[in-house]
């Protein structure tokens, strides 16, 4: 994930440099259009990378949530047993 973050940062830095270079050309120049296409390609790379990161994070969140649910289910019998034991003790204490 950090590799992807660095990739996005490098792409943004390249975009900044290319945008600075745009001032060297007139809007109608072929070079101007070429630079715009390169910038668009970098934005496309950023969006692809961001989507992959989003998918990774979604998977991690899902796995973490599943682990918490499983842990809760595993603890449920113990919790029920404790609650029943407490209630039985309360009944015994009240019956005496």
From Swiss-Prot:
Superkingdom per UniProt: Bacteria
- Report what the protein is called: SPbeta prophage-derived uncharacterized protein YosV
Organism phylogeny = Bacteria, Bacillati, Bacillota, Bacilli, Bacillales
Please name the gene that encodes this protein: yosV
């Amino acid at each position: 994930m950090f590799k992807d973050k660095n990739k996005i940062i490098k792409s943004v830095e390249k975009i900044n440099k290319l945008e600075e270079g745009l001032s060297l050309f007139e809007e109608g120049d072929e070079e101007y259009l070429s630079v715009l296409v390169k910038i668009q390609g970098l934005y496309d790379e950023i969006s692809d990378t961001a989507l992959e990161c989003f998918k990774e994070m979604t998977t991690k969140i899902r796995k973490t949530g599943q682990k918490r649910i499983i842990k809760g289910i595993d603890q449920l019998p113990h919790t029920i047993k404790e609650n029943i034991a407490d209630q039985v003790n309360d009944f015994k204490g009240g019956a005496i």
